[in-house]
UniProtKB/Swiss-Prot annotation:
This is Ribosomal RNA small subunit methyltransferase C. It is found in: Cytoplasm. Belongs to the methyltransferase superfamily. RsmC family. One of its GO terms (biological process) is rRNA base methylation. InterPro entries: DNA_methylase_N6_adenine_CS (IPR002052), Mtase_sm_N (IPR013675), rRNA_ssu_MeTfrase_C (IPR023543), RsmC/RlmG (IPR046977), SAM-dependent_MTases_sf (IPR029063), Small_mtfrase_dom (IPR007848).
Length: 332
């Protein structure tokens, strides 16, 4: 059981009425709180919840509608995303109760101050290195417009500016990260065919790929609903076509790909997690056509070349700088 869920269950007497659990982990919490429904924006956790509790959790960037009298937000990493989620929940709970639970190292003390916009926050519990806060909604806000909260910026490229649309919570929100900047300079001479931007975030790499290889089919994949929507907005802002997939890792990707291009993720909330990246290296060959290429950027300290060579083929370093390296390998 997730420690945040354990803290909630210490106060289960507070959750006897219809309840929405926002950002809930894929554990036993829905079994323990049969009156609760879930709202998830993580495709992997949503798949696990669907398998165990069919119809009791929704995958979306917007809060589901329902006759909730209270809601719990599991604190996400991003402050901007927390603002949006709290406003979305508070808008549905005039006079109701909004709870916030999170790890101390995840910033729950700081985030509890964000509850003050809706009433007087109270700390209810502190255990398992987590805290539980509550506020009664005295000032219910209007429903927030997610797209109005997007950060939009122009990326100057040799073939013209690219318009990027980044929603709250998306990796490197509102700016181009250093790893992707290095990889953008190494997208030449990719095999023609079906291209995949794995871990697409706001869709920068995928949009550049479609612009440079217009005859190629493009897919973009991310585990996060806000990233998936950001990528769709970025493609639309540039008049580009592409399939955007919500899936937990490379197993959800198409097969017979000509190339996989990636700035792979290695954070899950406040925790470092290399599982998705390592699984990409281990399983890329199953998704590439013969002669297909994996091209990715990674922190220089990560020992990826041995993994790539073990599971795919000879690994070349195409470029390095600013603490990152660009690796390339082809399926034989």
């Amino acid at each position: 059981m997730d420690p945040r869920s354990e803290v909630l269950l210490r106060q289960r007497h507070l959750f006897a009425t219809p309840l929405l659990l926002a950002g809930l982990p894929a554990d036993d919490l829905l079994a323990e709180l049969p009156q609760a429904q879930g709202w998830s924006w993580h495709a992997g956790e949503q798949a696990q919840l669907d398998a165990r509790f069919p119809g009791r959790s929704r995958f979306d960037t917007r809060a589901p509608t329902g006759a909730w009298t209270s809601a719990v937000l599991f604190l996400p990493k991003s402050r901007e995303l927390t603002d949006y989620l709290l406003a979305s929940l508070a808008a549905r709970l005039p006079g109701g109760e909004l709870f916030l639970v999170g790890e101390k190292r995840g910033g729950i003390e700081r985030a509890s101050k964000q509850l003050a916009a809706y009433g007087k926050p109270r700390k209810l519990d502190s255990a398992r290195h987590c805290q539980l806060w509550q506020v009664r909604i005295e000032q219910a806000p209007a429903e927030p417009d997610l797209h109005a909260l997007a950060q939009r910026y122009s990326l100057p490229l040799a073939d013209g500016e690219l318009q990027v649309v980044s929603l709250p919570g998306v990796f490197s929100h509102g700016r181009l990260d250093r790893g992707s900047a290095l990889l953008l300079g190494q997208l030449q001479a990719l095999p023609g065919g079906h291209l995949l931007d794995f871990g697409c975030g706001a869709g920068v790499l995928g949009a550049v790929l479609k612009r440079r290889y217009p005859a190629s089919r493009l897919s973009l994949l991310d585990v996060d609903a806000f990233a998936v929507e950001s990528s769709r907005l970025t493609l639309a802002a540039n008049g580009l076509d592409g399939e955007v997939i919500a899936a937990d890792g490379i197993d959800g990707a198409p097969r017979e790909l000509a190339a996989i291009v990636s700035n792979p993720p290695f954070h899950q909330g406040v925790h470092t997690d290399y599982q998705a990246s390592e699984r990409l290296l281990q399983r890329a060959a199953e998704h590439l056509a013969p002669g297909g290429e994996l091209r990715l950027v990674a922190n220089s300290f990560l020992k990826y070349p041995p993994l790539i060579e073990r599971h795919l083929g000879p690994c070349r370093t195409l470029a390095e700088g600013d603490g990152f390296r660009i690796y390339s390998a082809r399926r034989s």
